[in-house]
Curated annotation (Swiss-Prot):
Entry-linked SUPFAM superfamilies: SPOC domain-like, vWA-like
Name of the gene: YKU80
Pfam families xrefs: Ku, Ku_N
Subunit structure: Heterodimer of YKU70/HDF1 and YKU80/HDF2. Interacts with SIR4.
Organism: Saccharomyces cerevisiae (strain ATCC 204508 / S288c)
Protein name: ATP-dependent DNA helicase II subunit 2
Cellular compartments per GO CC: chromosome, telomeric region; Ku70:Ku80 complex
Length: 629
């Protein structure tokens, strides 16, 4: 949904105050709104109301309903800080107030919210939702007939957050649950589930944006494909040509966006930050007057900077000790002209390709659904089936677009099961593309050998020397600490249709799919720890210094969900008996070692300084030279 309106209703009854449920609701609101402020969407609206409140302030003049935040879009950091401060100030003033005992204004608050939403958006197509924080599910004094009328009046869905300790059986008897079940797409969550959700790293969904559209060629001549004629490979009798397209399967996560700003004061002497524009200027050092400079001036800078125009700057190539500027005719020839395409160059066994050779973001290669035909789909499906049956991986030459970099990639076949619109199970056949390292990459990175050494007949060479045996055992010992080789996980846990993983709201809510919650514990899904750590520290800085007005900032500890992901906690079993035997390692008792060391020191006891001086005097008196004198 491109447009979204979220209205938060916080129950500020005494029970919510005493059990710190209002503080928990504020923590969720703060995290949610600060996340919304990063995107600053003009179509993402928020508002907030307080129910069961002794303060009355709303558009309908209904008692005990306080609109603490009017409709706001886009959500900004400044507005979020001001809103959380007002809510915190209210809680501090009424934390021990007993005047709101027995107030019941939740139904009135729902009606006020419904009228305000209708007045604000009228007939606009927008996702409307109300998030209610309460610990009293029996708060609604309403009959079944009134629930039907309220369902017709409310044109929004309700997301109920249960802040109490009610069991499932107690929930079933409450009027709140009846109202949630009566309104389509409404849900109910527990408050603790929301707190876990905002403190756990969430895997982002990769959007299916087409990144390549071209030909998958098998048996084609590479030289004949490097032309601008797209029908060249189609006319080759020895070439199997399939029209395919590529979509991103994984996406690299970048750090938080930062801008350079300067602190200034406005007319009201309030500090604010203004972005700084960067201007690049070029200058040269003029050495023409260097001979005329006196010796006293030579101690300082002997160069005179001369500013030059940007139009006078051109690229020069190093040739020996000089710089050469190529003419425009030769500059075009320095660019390697390449044309988009995917050429299969060979196949190898799946077990022969270690995972650490995959060095880029991966992409899905599928039959072209836009420019292809039925024959392309059948040929591509047959290729995937053959590779799956023989457990093969293809090595291909890949060019994503014209004049882009040429890469050698690995194509791994995958079979993904999902349900279509009619709930019919369907298998999607695809190839997963990932870049392989070049020689330049191996110069700066330590990659193990791709394949085991073999003879000309294909027989593997045996390593019989002790050094090779020790190296092999040590390699197995180190690999046993790796989390790379784990039990095979169903592909459905990783690759799912975009419709099953995308949500209709930007709110951080727990997933109703249990498989997705279990995937968060998968040791192969390692989140980008530094990004989440940056975000955690930044949000905590805003909370402490901007909202709580603290003078000092205390860096928060790393959440347990990230701590568990840093250290490998799942590894293979390895029998180290053979390695201990080859290396001759023996376990030595520490107490025995201390006693042997003490005996050796006593045996070779070093005399003190006075003893050495006395020995020197005796030696000097007893020498023949002194007696002759």
């Amino acid at each position: 949904m491109s447009s979204e309106s979220t209205t938060f209703i916080v129950d500020v009854s005494p029970s919510m105050m005493k059990n710190n449920n209002v503080s928990k609701s504020m923590a969720y609101l703060e995290y949610t709104l600060l996340n919304k402020s990063k995107k600053s969407r003009k179509t993402d609206w928020i508002s907030c109301y307080l129910a069961n409140c002794p303060v009355s302030e709303n558009s309908q003049e209904i008692p005990n309903v306080f609109q603490i935040q009017s409709f706001l879009a886009p959500v900004t950091t400044t507005a979020t800080i001001g809103f959380i401060k007002r809510l915190k100030q209210y809680c501090d003033q009424h934390s021990h107030d007993s005047s709101n005992e027995g107030l019941q204004s939740m139904i009135q608050c729902l009606l006020v919210v419904s009228l305000d939403i209708k007045q604000q958006f009228q007939a606009r197509k927008i996702l409307k939702q109300i998030v209610v924080f309460t610990d009293n599910l029996d708060d609604l004094d309403i009959t079944d007939e009134e629930i039907d009328l309220l369902t017709e009046e409310l044109s929004t869905r309700i997301i109920l957050i249960d802040c109490g300790k009610d069991t499932q059986e107690e929930r079933k008897k409450s009027n709140w649950l009846k109202l949630v079940e009566a309104i389509p797409n409404s849900r109910i969550y527990n408050m603790n589930e929301l707190l876990v959700e905002i403190t756990s790293p969430a895997t982002s969904v990769v959007k299916p944006v087409r990144v390549f559209s071209g030909e998958l060629r098998l048996g084609a001549d590479i030289l004949s494909t490097q032309t601008s004629n797209p029908s060249g490979s189609m006319q080759d009798e020895n070439c199997l040509c399939i029209k395919v397209e590529a979509f991103p399967a994984t996406k690299a996560v970048s750090g938080l966006n930062r801008k350079t700003a300067v602190e200034v004061e406005d007319s009201q002497k309030k500090e604010r930050y203004v972005g700084v524009k960067s201007i690049i200027e070029y200058e040269i050092h003029n050495e023409g007057n260097k001979k005329n400079v006196s010796e006293d001036d030579q101690s300082g800078s002997s160069y005179i900077p001369v500013t030059i125009s940007k139009d006078s700057v051109t690229k020069a190539y190093r040739y020996g000790a000089d710089y050469v500027v190529l003419p425009s005719v030769l500059v075009d020839q320095t660019v390697y002209e390449s044309f988009p395409g995917l050429d299969l160059r060979g196949f190898l066994n799946r077990e022969a390709l270690p995972r650490y050779f995959l060095t880029s973001e991966s992409s899905f290669i599928t039959a072209d659904t836009r420019l292809g035909c039925q024959s392309d789909l059948m040929a591509f499906s047959a290729l995937v089936d053959v590779m799956l049956e023989n457990r093969k991986i293809a090595v291909a030459r890949y060019v994503s677009k014209k004049d882009s970099e040429v890469n050698m990639c690995a194509l791994c076949p995958v079979l993904i099961e999902h349900s279509n619109i009619n709930s019919e199970k369907k298998f999607v056949k695809s190839l997963t593309l990932c870049r392989l390292p070049f020689a330049e990459d191996e110069r700066v990175t330590d990659f193990p050998k791709l394949l085991d050494r073999t003879t000309t007949s294909g027989v593997p060479l045996k390593k019989e020397t002790d050094g090779h045996q020790i190296d092999e055992l040590m390699e197995q010992f180190v690999d046993s600490m790796d989390t790379d080789e784990l039990p095979e996980i169903p592909l459905g846990n990783y690759y799912q249709p975009i419709g099953e993983v995308t949500t209709d709201t930007t709110l951080p809510l727990p997933s109703l799919n249990k498989d997705q919650e279990e995937n968060k514990k998968d040791p192969l899904r390692i989140p980008t720890v530094f990004v989440y750590r940056q975000q955690q520290v930044l949000l905590e800085w805003i909370h402490q210094l901007m909202i709580n007005d603290s003078r000092e900032f205390e860096i928060p500890e790393l959440p347990d969900s990230l701590k568990n992901k840093i250290s490998p906690y799942t590894h293979k079993k390895f029998d180290s008996t053979k390695l201990v035997e080859v290396l001759g390692i023996k376990k030595v008792d520490k107490l025995k070692l201390d006693s042997e060391l003490k005996t050796e020191l006593e045996r070779e006891k070093i005399p003190d300084l006075e003893t050495l001086l006395k020995r020197g005097e005796q030696h000097s008196r007893g020498s023949p030279n002194n007696s002759n004198n």
